[in-house]
Every structure is written in C-alpha cells, then in structure tokens.
Amino acid sequence: MEMKQISDSTIKITIQLEDLEKRGMEMADFLVPQEKTEEFFYTILDELEMPDNFLDSGMLSFRVTPKPDKVDVFVTKSKLDKNLSFEDLADLPDMDELSHMSPDEFLKTLEKSIFEKSKEDIEAVKSLETAEAEEREQLSQEAADEQSAENAERYIYYILRFEDIKAAAAFAQTVDYKIDLSELYKYDSAYYLTILVDVEGFPERYPAWLLAKMREFADDSDITRAVLQEHGHLLLVTDAVSGLQKVECL
C-alpha cells in the first residue's frame, strides 16, 4: 500500500489487488457501503502512518476509485461532529429574537449556521474532487504520451538525397515495398525524398534491412523533415514515389 497526502484535508491511499485479497476484500465489496468496508478502511488507516493533522480529526469520509490492478481510496477529514447539537450553533440569535421569527426565517437562519459549521467539509469535498480531476488529467496525459511513443516506434521516416530529379525517378522504379507516405522536396540544389513506413508486424531488423536496400540506389541524409518543411520547396505531396514512378527517365 502507498499513501500520498494531496492537501491538508485529503490523502490518497493506493491498494494493490494482492493486498485486497490478503485482507479478504474484493472490488465488489466497494460497490455497496457496508460495515465490512468501513472496518477495512479504518484497519488500513491503523496500519499506515497517518499525518498528525488527521489523527485528531472528527469524521472521515472515503471515496473509492477502482482501477484495473488497484484501488485508490481518497480520505477526507472533517471537523464537523457526527451529531450536530444546538450548542454547536453558538452564532444563532437568542431565544427572544427566535420567538419573533417565522418558521421560514428560522429554518433559513438554522441552515446558514449549519452551512458555516460545515464549510470546511464542503471545501474538503471540493479539494477531493479537484485532486481526482487532476489525477484523471495526469492519467490521460500519460496514456497520450504512451500512445505517442507507440506511434513513434511503429512508424519510421527515411530521408533520402538525390543529385537530380532523374536519380530520384530511377530510385522510385526500384521501390517494391509498401510506403505509407512520401514527399519530394528541392533544397540547396539537391532533391530529397521523405519516406514514411509502418514497421508494425515486421521483424525487428526490418527497418535496418529496408534502409540498406534504399542505400543501394540513394544516399541517406542527416537533414530532418522539419528543415525541409521550413526551408525546402515541396514538389510532390503525400505519394511522391508513385508520382516519380510515372516519370520517364531519358
């Protein structure tokens, strides 16, 4: 189990599925509030070294966020006692003033006083909701980063350099493998082909083999696609190799 303090009023406890099983708990136990669940919460609180400001707090509220391999438990402290009495409502008007209030006015005054007493609880709940939202955003960003990394590994860009358009057209005639995207640029009196290949499903050494095959008829270049896009002149878009294959080499 891991514990992380998110704010003065909220901590997050991460419990792995193995820890749940050791304690005789299942995911389904958290779907419906029950005495077994509450006992489990307070048991893990006893096991963990709680922050000092949580030890003497009043009520504790728990919110569970199930994950595929773990459970996140958000614990929010409250300073509002379970049994709110009129002695706690010291800011209520005196009895003489209360006697002149209509029932509606009295209820509004009582509601206002209770709201003031429970304001910290409301702020704690808002803090908890903010923490959950930030965690969801972080997880979403991590998933996006992972997807981006996977895409980067799946696709490979090759940049090839040719002295003239005739050499580029001659190279295009040799292409007998699948290309997902290709562009032809002119930059500094030379011609450049950018070739995007999807290598998913191919052997690990396929990208190196493909580069060696390309270098039989072209020179690979250190110039990046970004440089070509910014400083080069785009001649053929998207399917440049196919376009060059239609050029008759004299």
UniProtKB/Swiss-Prot annotation:
GO molecular function: protein-macromolecule adaptor activity
InterPro entries tied to this protein: MecA_C_sf, Neg-reg_MecA
Superkingdom of origin: Bacteria
Domain note: The N-terminal domain probably binds unfolded/aggregated proteins; the C-terminal domain interacts with ClpC.
Function: Enables the recognition and targeting of unfolded and aggregated proteins to the ClpC protease or to other proteins involved in proteolysis.
The family this protein is said to belong to: Belongs to the MecA family.
Known partners and oligomeric status: Homodimer.
Protein name: Adapter protein MecA
Taxonomic lineage of the native organism: Bacteria, Bacillati, Bacillota, Bacilli, Lactobacillales
Gene this protein is translated from: mecA
